[in-house]
Each structure stands twice: as structure tokens, then as C-alpha cells.
Amino acid sequence: MNAKEMRGKEAAELKQELESLLRAHFALRMQVATQQSNKTADLGKLRRDIARVKTIMREKAGQA
């Protein structure tokens, strides 16, 4: 999902998306740590998605 699509969402939806991304990031970190997965590039993608959601949430909070 790109930033333009995220800006159209409500704050509650963004919070739910953030929780989902954080859970996925944790699960992938554990898989990499236990060598069940070697998709380390996906960790970076998830980190950037989390930052993107947090940025948009902060923008919306500043506008309100």
C-alpha cells in the first residue's frame, strides 16, 4: 500500500494497519533470528511501511 492510499484512510484504520505491520515485523524478525527464513530484505520493507504509517498518522494529528 502506498502513502496516497493510506492518506485516504481514517485514523482507526491506520492504527489497525500499524498494529498489523508491527506484528508481521516481529514475526519475521523471529523467523530470521531462528534461521527459519532468510528474507532479510522484507524486514527493511516492513520497517519502511511502519515509518510511512506513523508519518501519516502524525500528519493527520497535526491537522486536527
UniProtKB/Swiss-Prot annotation:
Pfam families: Ribosomal_L29. One of its GO terms (molecular function) is structural constituent of ribosome. One of its GO terms (cellular component) is cytosolic large ribosomal subunit. SUPFAM superfamilies: Ribosomal protein L29 (L29p) (SSF46561). Keywords: Ribonucleoprotein, Ribosomal protein. GO terms for biological process: translation. CDD domains: Ribosomal_L29_HIP. The keyword Protease does not apply. Belongs to the universal ribosomal protein uL29 family. PANTHER family: 60S RIBOSOMAL PROTEIN L35/50S RIBOSOMAL PROTEIN L29, LARGE RIBOSOMAL SUBUNIT PROTEIN UL29C. This is Large ribosomal subunit protein uL29. It comes from Thiobacillus denitrificans (strain ATCC 25259 / T1).
